[in-house]
Amino acid sequence: MSLSKEVPSFRWTQSLRRELSSYTQQTKTLVLKDAKMIADSLDFNQVSQVQRVLRKAKRSDADLDKLRDLNQEVDKLMVMKSVQKNTILKLGDLGKDELMDLATDLEKLKRKIGDSGRDGPRPYMGNLTQSQLDKRTQILRVLGFQQQTGVSRGVVRLWDVSNPAKLNNQFGSMPALTIACMTVQGGETMNNVVQALTSLGLLYTVKYPNLEDLEKLTQEHDCLQIITRDESAVNISGYNFSLSAAVKAGASLIDGGNMLETIRVTPNNFSSIIKATLTAKRKENMFVDERPGNRNPYENLLYKVCLSGEGWPYIGSRSQINGRSWDNTSVDLNPKPDPGPRAPEKNGQNLRLSNLTEMQEAVIKEAMQKLDPTNTIWMDIEGPPTDPVELAVFQPTSGYYFHCFRKPHDEKGFKNGSRHSHGILLKDLEDAQPGLLSYILGLLPQNIVITTQGADDIRKLLDVHGRKDIKLVDVRLTNEQSRIFEQQVWERYNSLCRAHNGVIVPKKKNKESNIQKEPHCALLDCIMFQSVLDGHLPDTSLKPLLPDNLVHQAKPAFVM
């Protein structure tokens, strides 16, 4: 792709927001909690000293120590932070093409950011010493050349430090810190600051706020006068009142708009976020521009997400993190060992298998031996295939079944599914055994045939877990056919499933169709589908293959 191609920056931002909407959260409450803690507890005399340091043209090791010490104090006061979490993505986490795409873009980012050591354009420095660089600047000035900063009003600040690696992750704004500084140093109430920044955030949902917008909003919100009208300097810190810092704070306060700033990365959703980012990249033909300059929206998201596999990439404190994105996220293109009948491949959505003890694994293996691969085996799930919350595997001839649950990573999507489909409440998943669902799928016999009602989601679920060997048969019942035995099944077997306690609200567009008043339970659905094929309820008694104390974690006892 030609590097001269213009970047439709805000369109890219909107596309990334849409693609990553399921990973955004409502952050206002946490941000304000952190902001109040900082405002009440931080030594703002120390803040003023650091702000003076950052206005200096040249800064020393002692200056950097002041910044790092203050960052540590802020980090201790905050709940919203990113921690050191290095990630190696392998085949199975992402496809080969996706891994290669990611590796290429991280390498380009390394050349763009790492080699330059700054975000903006700058003169080539080669391996010249600082005294040689100063002399070169003097010669150019005598000859009438302008300083080649590439930014008309920006100021290049120089850090003359013995260990440049200590500069990493000490910069970047945090909404909680921005709000606290505007409140305390601006002599404002936090409510006034929040109202003003919220206006900026709402504007940011439709465009990038600029200085003209800021001037107009300042007429309504006087506290915005503290925002600097100058272009940002290189290596701007969270203690500066820049427009970009204010806009980021506003984005974290509006509780809507699918703002990228509100993404939270966890080990369970990391690879899914990367996959969604690469999907948006392909749709909009996004690219990493290796030329010096500010990061475009795709570069910015990729850098921030890959910096740590756990935390808030945009708005959290990240001063705990060592290294850069290309250090902390790496790609291994070697295929994973064949998991055989035991372990699934991960796709970033599955809880870790290490949560199961060896004894628990042995119990599950023994239970799996009781399934007869030559007879019908049903499978059903609740929740999306990339984030399932319930799994049932049921064999009608024997009455044996696996039935387990899993906490979702996308709580917003889960609540929507609970309201309109399965009725599972989040509190009823708190004791779900981590790793169990994935382990069961990994242990299913090789090349087994699974019967389903609607195969698409099950196929995707199995593919995510590296079980492409499993074949599916879709009975393709109509919605009306599949529910013929619904009431009878619930009356007889409701004791088998006690997690579906929410009220089901029909979607408006379905009011004219058959309204399903009962929640969807993966196990009971398998039973009613088989009942439709048989024309009656099961004759055999149903027997769980796993004890309840394995499916659910023991709750801690209350001690006086």
From Swiss-Prot:
| Spans annotated as Binding site for the cap structure m7GTP | 54-236
> Keywords of this protein's UniProt record, alphabetized?
Capsid protein, Helical capsid protein, Host cytoplasm, Host-virus interaction, Hydrolase, Inhibition of host IKBKE by virus, Inhibition of host innate immune response by virus, Inhibition of host RLR pathway by virus, Interferon antiviral system evasion, Manganese, Metal-binding, Ribonucleoprotein, RNA-binding, Viral immunoevasion, Viral nucleoprotein, Virion, Zinc
Q: What class of enzyme is it?
A: hydrolase
Q: According to the UniProt record, where is the region Disordered?
A: 323-349
Xref: InterPro entries = Nucleocapsid_arenaviridae, Nucleocapsid_C_arenaviridae, Nucleocapsid_C_sf, Nucleocapsid_N_arenaviridae, RNaseH-like_sf
Question: Which segments show compositional bias classed as Polar residues?
Answer: 323-332
User: Which HAMAP family has this protein been placed in?
Assistant: ARENA_NCAP
Q: What does this protein do?
A: Encapsidates the genome, protecting it from nucleases. The encapsidated genomic RNA is termed the nucleocapsid (NC). Serves as template for viral transcription and replication. The increased presence of protein N in host cell does not seem to trigger the switch from transcription to replication as observed in other negative strain RNA viruses.
The protein here is known as: Nucleoprotein
Q: Please state the gene responsible for encoding this protein.
A: N
